[in-house]
Amino acid sequence: MEQPWPPPGPWSLPRAEGEAEEENDLDVFPSSPRCPQLPGGSAQMYSHGIELACQKQKEFVKSSVACKWNLAEAQQKLGSLALHNSESLDQEHAKAQIAVSELRQREEEWRQKEEALVQREKMCLWSMDAISKDVFNKSFINQDKRKDTEDEDKSESFMQKYEQKIRHFGMLSRWDDSQRFLSDHPYLVCEETAKYLILWCFHLEAEKKGALMEQIAHQAVVMQFIMEMAKNCNVDPRGCFRLFFQKAKAEEEGYFEAFKNELEAFKSRVRLYSQSQSFQPMTVQNHVPHSGVGSIGLLESLPQNPDYLQYSINTALCSLNSVVHKEDDEPKMMDTV
């Protein structure tokens, strides 16, 4: 008989030498949180606040992939051209130099925007009034009624159906194990998985389970980078996730640094949001004993995200020729970042 998910019992850190071999061993998952009944529509405002945090997280990852990863591609191309002395390559070399300069400028612009946003959030700490005003002005709150309800139902159904596997992926701690798991379950490479993991991080931090939050945050950023790489390259994400793991395991200069920087920034944002007034009502005492429903209950209560990206980003320097389709036999521990 299938056991209820998540299993009961106190949470603990995953095994030091890797993830748990059996899903039944994973007693680290918290009880399913739910929003308390707060006066004045505060519960709904709380959900909107988390939704806004998810939206901003996607925008940050988008900037990392668009600027930092493309910059690394341009630098690699520039380096390869420098190895040749043929005059016929002079024009190509000049174009590559211009591309590097433009990408560096874009990266600096995004960095300044991110710093300004973080400073503003530290001052405001996401007060209820600020959230209410921000939510009201967001286009995805006032969007047309034409939103496809079938897509919404499909997204909710997906997270309900594959909640166990999404959580299992969240607990993996090796690059090779994560790649192998996605190879066995390619349907998990999607926006719904990324959203579930992001929300899970917020609730873990609200429960004061920082160590577990950092583990899930790593996998959340992994999935986000895969999705943004696919959009950047205009390919199916199920066909390019191996490229991400190839670059991550090789710790290629530029690529891995962009991932580590975004991971640390994401964890900092989660901690910052958890300190805001909008997260204060979400405490451990508001949890109820597990009844087999699963944490998908809160996810279903959130409004569906819109099309996260409103414009396409530079794809000229994106190449998937180096994708490695062969799985490594020997697992390799990921760096603890």
UniProtKB/Swiss-Prot annotation:
Residues 1-42 are annotated as: Disordered. Pfam families: CDC37_M. InterPro entries: Cdc37, Cdc37_Hsp90-bd, Cdc37_Hsp90-bd_sf. Keywords: Chaperone, Coiled coil, Cytoplasm, Phosphoprotein. The keyword Oxidoreductase does not apply. GO terms for molecular function: heat shock protein binding; protein-folding chaperone binding; unfolded protein binding. GO terms for biological process: protein folding; protein stabilization. It is found in: Cytoplasm. Residues 278-337 are annotated as: Required for interaction with STIP1. Residues 2-171 are annotated as: Self-association. GO terms for cellular component: cytosol. Residues 147-277 are annotated as: Self-association and interaction with Hsp90. The keyword GTP-binding does not apply. Residues 1-11 have a biased composition (Pro residues). Its main location: cytoplasm. The modification Phosphoserine is found at residues 32, 88. Residues 267-337 are annotated as: Interaction with Hsp70. Self-associates. Forms complexes with Hsp70 and Hsp90. Interacts with CDC37, FKBP4, PPID and STIP1. Co-chaperone that binds to numerous proteins and promotes their interaction with Hsp70 and Hsp90. Belongs to the CDC37 family. This is Hsp90 co-chaperone Cdc37-like 1. It comes from Pongo abelii (Sumatran orangutan). The lineage of its organism: Eukaryota, Metazoa, Chordata, Craniata, Vertebrata.
